[in-house]
Amino acid sequence: MDFREEYKQKLVSADEAVKLIKSGDWVDYGWCTNTVDALDQALAKRTDELTDVKLRGGILMKPLAVFAREDAGEHFCWNSWHMSGIERKMINRGVAYYCPIRYSELPRYYRELDCPDDVAMFQVAPMDAHGYFNFGPSASHLGAMCERAKHIIVEVNENMPRCLGGTECGIHISDVTYIVEGSNPPIGELGAGGPATDVDKAVAKLIVDEIPNGACLQLGIGGMPNAVGSLIAESDLKDLGVHTEMYVDAFVDIAKAGKINGSKKNIDRYRQTYAFGAGTKKMYDYLDDNPELMSAPVDYTNDIRSISALDNFISINNAVDIDLYGQVNAESAGIKQISGAGGQLDFVLGAYLSKGGKSFICLSSTFKTKDGQVQSRIRPTLANGSIVTDARPNTHYVVTEYGKVNLKGLSTWQRAEALISIAHPDFRDDLIKEAEQMHIWRRSNR
């Protein structure tokens, strides 16, 4: 069947398409790399006509046009599934709010929401010969999002990579209300946050020493996971697999070094499985039309049952800080939301259930405040208002540049002792004093 005629019938300008949106509507803006561009600019032109339009999305990679005006909050409200630096600034302006989620559950949220989307709009790759628009590197929850949306608008971007996968990786033209051809902006890029530091490299070495041949990898975003990836690429490891929430540049380096073939994976053999990808153009070019990659919905990639089915699963993630009980905060600085819960807990739990699996929470032992003060990331208790991303019974390995400790099965005093042993030496005595006051320190430890 030739879908070109239907394409012509549904093709409209961005200005025409956004006329579907009314005051009070819920509107999905896409996710990460396929957040709308031309449609965002078109909706911004209608600001004065609209009130209480509730927008949903996450991991914004550039500022939105609808929030350019100072009074934008009187017309639009941003609801984020996961915060980027841009969204943190929007929270400070009072125009954005975080939606706490367990990322693996997000498709179900959409299928059961009391307030489904009035309009869902997002960027896609050009239509293929079969009438499908590929979601690009963001299968994630988009299929579920489209199922209950009253109207769907796709913004075609010729630069969007066509990402192959299993299910829910695109939408058929028959399900689309309008098609908009945008200006084909470059896909938003997300770097690793600068080159790896000596601390990053020290942590990476401690983790790589724990990775066996044939392991299946999950890497988070940031300097430390990328440092781990670089070290793996230079190592003698072989027959590695990938099953991850987020595909990052480090995986490209590991794959091109010949370390990844997926031959030992118990499921999805020979495929690198991921829910969404965000990185540099190098990564997008690698993802494009690559049959080795498998883009999949997040309720599959992050399902504990999927993760635990893969032997020797190695999960590597960052944290903001951790307390002496082993509670991990990976998303906030006190009451200030930094990122989101994402799928970290899913992988912490799934990796431990995997035969031979291990979960690593990595962090530098210290950080500097804006006024130059050095503080410990290992704290007696989390700061007031900080979020517990991973509860203490779930925390497995914790790694700093001073060592790695396994918290599973340890009592409170053993946990305190273990964590203090990998804290920066300048803070250990103070941590011991705090542990004594908390009644989780035994004098015989000294």
Swiss-Prot record:
It catalyses: butanoate + acetyl-CoA = butanoyl-CoA + acetate; propanoate + acetyl-CoA = propanoyl-CoA + acetate. Keywords: Fatty acid metabolism, Lipid metabolism, Transferase. Its EC number is 2.8.3.-. Optimum pH is 7-8. Pfam families: AcetylCoA_hyd_C, AcetylCoA_hydro. GO terms for biological process: acetate metabolic process; acetyl-CoA metabolic process; butyrate biosynthetic process. The active site is at 245 (5-glutamyl coenzyme a thioester intermediate). CoA binds at residues 220-224, 320, 343. GO terms for molecular function: acetate CoA-transferase activity; propionate CoA-transferase activity. The keyword Ribonucleoprotein does not apply. InterPro entries: AcetylCoA_hyd_C (IPR026888), AcetylCoA_hyd_C_sf (IPR038460), ActCoA_hydro (IPR046433), ActCoA_hydro_N (IPR003702), Butryl-CoA_acetate_CoA_Tfrase (IPR023990), NagB/RpiA_transferase-like (IPR037171). Pathway: Lipid metabolism; butanoate metabolism. Coenzyme A-transferase that converts butyryl-CoA to butyrate. Can also use proprionyl-CoA as substrate in vitro. The fermentation acid butyrate is of special interest, as it has been shown to serve as the preferred energy source for the gut wall and also influences cell differentiation and apoptosis in the colon, and this seems to aid in protection against colon cancer and inflammatory bowel disease. Formation of butyrate via butyryl-CoA CoA-transferase is the only available route for butyrate synthesis in the majority of human gut isolates. NCBIfam families: butyr_acet_CoA. Belongs to the acetyl-CoA hydrolase/transferase family. Butyryl-CoA CoA-transferase subfamily. This is Butyryl-CoA:acetate CoA-transferase.
